[in-house]
């Protein structure tokens, strides 16, 4: 009997019967997004919906707009690959519409860098969120086209390790006890990472034996979804990005480990409506506290395909801080800016435009406005905004598709910042430390939108190559300057975050400006054409970073340092 079940398991894994599911979400890391983006560019079409991830029915709809007969041989190969990825769906299909999928992925990664002064995840280009777990066990279930659920179990080291060097939040909070708009409730006990073991060491790996460093934050991906051919409702934990940009989106960016969302989407070939509720953690201490406060980031986006060559996204969004949950505020058709209660709400207006000028040539841009002076309003608060513009050229060569791009991004110092309510999220990671200073929850503060927040000036130029058989690679150069503003710095001239955001400087603010250059190349090669089972891929990333401080008064550079960072890995999926 044991031999029978072993043989049956092998047959199931090697010879799956795939099932299509409309409600299935395609992971944000899937290559299908870059493939369909490239196909749209080659077909003289503006980019498809830039709210990602998509459902299977969305991907099928967007791909159906491509005329494969008009594509070159390389384009048709990419088209067929994307079509297979959509149609494959779940691995096994049974009677009465029941289907399921599952597997296990082993990923062994090695990290090397030359300068141990680059010792936090913020100082690495490929940060903790991008590093793969040693083991990922995942499963998906569907009962017909309309229902889908998925979850994973991870074995990986935590975001904080027992061997890290820690400080206390009392050392980095403002004089009135805040980080951003979050009050620090236990500043004398709650630690933060000053120097990370896994980023400090010159040689490291994702293999570890100290179980005290095990990450309890899983599942990292947990999806409950039901929907049809043109609609979907989901309750999910997954990576998310809203907006087209290689530098980073101003609305919601995918640099975070995950986002918890309740999402409703209606879509067709010409219009997509997204209503997204993103619950935000408000606890900042290391202990297991209760809270009477809650926060939700409420997002609604309207995506219009005005012409085949032009798409426009309009979005109005608000973070709502509440102690009493009032259902009236959830109306997705309301204009959030008219709620007019700054102690409870902070709104962000957003617009995005994508234009296909000709075959292979696209231009695009996004603008976010956090704060602007209205008629009859005082000028006590500073304006807060950001924008990015970019262009792409897509063409076929070397039996694949190249996309060359160049982008510029500028954010004002106080973008995402305000007293009371702001656009910062707090993610707490549980840690089994060996002493009282590191045992419990460790909070990490991040911007929901652009990774580096306000007070930044960034240029990025690069190239992406997608091959239908072997995978894809990317290389780029990024130049950035960052002023004095940070998550830990007060937005108020008196250093009190309970008071209004009134710093009046322009980007880059302060006397000393951080200037950085990044040169990066990364890629992943699939061996599926050589070996159909198990799925094996080899990947790597090499980054060179140069950082210095520029003094605006005396025009001098100081504290120049560099680091070469190398990540190599192999994944085996069964």
Name what the model sees in each region.
Residues 2-10:
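Sec-dependent signal peptide recognition
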Residues 125-128, 164, 200-212, 419, ...:
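Extracellular/periplasm-exposed beta-strand and loop segments of Gram-negative cell-envelope proteins
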Residues 14-16:
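N-terminal signal peptide c-region/cleavage motif recognized by signal peptidases
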Residues 232, 241, 253-441, 454-461, ...:
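Signature for the C-terminal beta-barrel architecture of outer-membrane proteins
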